[in-house]
């Protein structure tokens, strides 16, 4: 029995030596290589599965976003009466904006719409400002979200080089994005102020010399009041806050009721007129100061 074991062991040793000399794989080597081959084949499969899952997830997210964005607030002026240009109040259609008023005005305002709001819905407010002597330009945003084109004001300002001084502003999300634009341009001497409607700044403007006016409706239930109060110290020194009694969030535009908003006790036209008056008073007071007189 012992002899058989010895012969068996010797045979295995001989086979191993022969395999090494002839470069033939042993059964153990073959198994290892087989496992490595299987593992190598599995890696691309796992990568394909992961990429496919990621692609599906991105498609679902994109579909959800487009469904959300398409449920937007449309301009109630179906016949575009507010876009009619007259000799006393010219209206110019740009590639992605509507400009109301004198293209050579002393002061211009570039306005960013609120989230999911059709930009032409702010035409009545822009006309009110134009009637007070401003060039008021409302910008069309990609998918109606201002965060997709924060620097839209650059193109508008380039199209109207004869305007004396520029302000930027916006409604709701548009106001917050306008504030970010103001931060980015506060130090280059090309921007004079910020207008916020139903909005607040998440960017620190406290150390700038910009003018700033913030307006909101007393019945606004969309605006985050806590954020409005907490972020007030981010505005420049001398910023003014105006509460429009009876106004709400949607009343700054002409797009109808907004989900979650309070009911206004004044008409949108009244709210827009009061808004234009307050902006006009504030801006004129800013330029009445000796240090700002040369800007307008």
Give the ranges of each region predicted by the language model.
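Hydrophobic membrane-insertion alpha-helices, especially the h-region
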Residues: 49-66
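Short beta-strand element of the alpha/beta-hydrolase
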Residues: 106-114
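Short alpha-helix in the alpha/beta-hydrolase fold that links the catalytic acid
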Residues: 125, 223-233
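Conserved alpha/beta-hydrolase
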Residues: 126-146
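Gly/Ala-rich beta-loop-alpha elbow adjacent to hydrolase catalytic centers
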Residues: 170-178
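A conserved short beta-strand
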Residues: 189-199
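Short beta-strand/loop motif that positions the catalytic acidic residue
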Residues: 214-216
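C-terminal catalytic-base region of ester-bond hydrolases, centering on the histidine
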Residues: 231-296
